[in-house]
C-alpha cells in the first residue's frame, strides 16, 4: 500500500447530512457511520441536533449544525437565536453563513456584528461560510479579515448550493488567514483524490456527504 492509501482522512471529515428531506432514519445512519469511521463530526440541520447529540453522546464525534443556511440573509437576531438554540440542544460546532449582500455592498461593520455576536455569545467553535464561488478576490480578502476579527475558528469555503471547494480557494484562504484559523473545504468533495488535494492545499476539515466514498482505498 502507498502513503496515499494509508493516510487517514477520518479526523478531517465532517460527515454531512443537510438534505431537507432527511428523516430520523437518515440521521441515525449518518451518526452510526460517523461513530464507526471515527469522523471528526456530523453536520446536520438544526432540527436534528438533539437527535444527533443523543446518538453520539458516548462517542468523541462532535455535533455541528448550520446557521443562516444556505443564504446567510437572515436577520442577525434570527441567526443569534438559531445559534443559541443549537448550542442549548448540544451542538458544539456552528457553520454560519455570512451575510453576502452586506459584504458585496461593502458594509463591513454589519457583516462583522452579524458573525461576531455568535462567536461571543455561544462560546463554541464557529466556522464562517464565505461562499467563495460568488466572491471576487477583493471580497474574499475582506471576508477573511472580518471573520478573523470576529473570532471565528474556521473559514469554510462553501454551502455547496453555489458550487463547491476548489484547491485554489483553499490555498487562498490559508494564505489570507496566515494560518490563524482552520480551513474547512466543502461542496462537491466526492473522491479520495479530491480530499487529499484539498488537504495538501491547506484544508484542516472537509465537509462532505460522500464520506464513505473517501474512505475507500
UniProtKB/Swiss-Prot annotation:
Gene Ontology MF annotations: deoxyribose-phosphate aldolase activity
Cellular component aspect of the GO annotation: cytoplasm
Active site (catalytic residues): 95 (proton donor/acceptor), 156 (schiff-base intermediate with acetaldehyde), 184 (proton donor/acceptor)
Reactions accelerated catalytically: 2-deoxy-D-ribose 5-phosphate = D-glyceraldehyde 3-phosphate + acetaldehyde
GO annotation, biological process: 2-deoxyribose 1-phosphate catabolic process; carbohydrate catabolic process; deoxyribonucleotide catabolic process
Pathway given in the UniProt record: Carbohydrate degradation; 2-deoxy-D-ribose 1-phosphate degradation; D-glyceraldehyde 3-phosphate and acetaldehyde from 2-deoxy-alpha-D-ribose 1-phosphate: step 2/2
Membrane spanning stretches: none
Cellular localization per UniProt: Cytoplasm
Xref: Pfam families: DeoC
Enzyme class: lyase
Keywords, in A-Z order: Cytoplasm, Lyase, Schiff base
Keyword Endoplasmic reticulum: no
Similarity section: Belongs to the DeoC/FbaB aldolase family. DeoC type 1 subfamily.
Function comment: Catalyzes a reversible aldol reaction between acetaldehyde and D-glyceraldehyde 3-phosphate to generate 2-deoxy-D-ribose 5-phosphate.
PANTHER family: DEOXYRIBOSE-PHOSPHATE ALDOLASE
Official protein name in the record: Deoxyribose-phosphate aldolase
Taxonomy of the source species: Bacteria, Bacillati, Cyanobacteriota, Cyanophyceae, Acaryochloridales
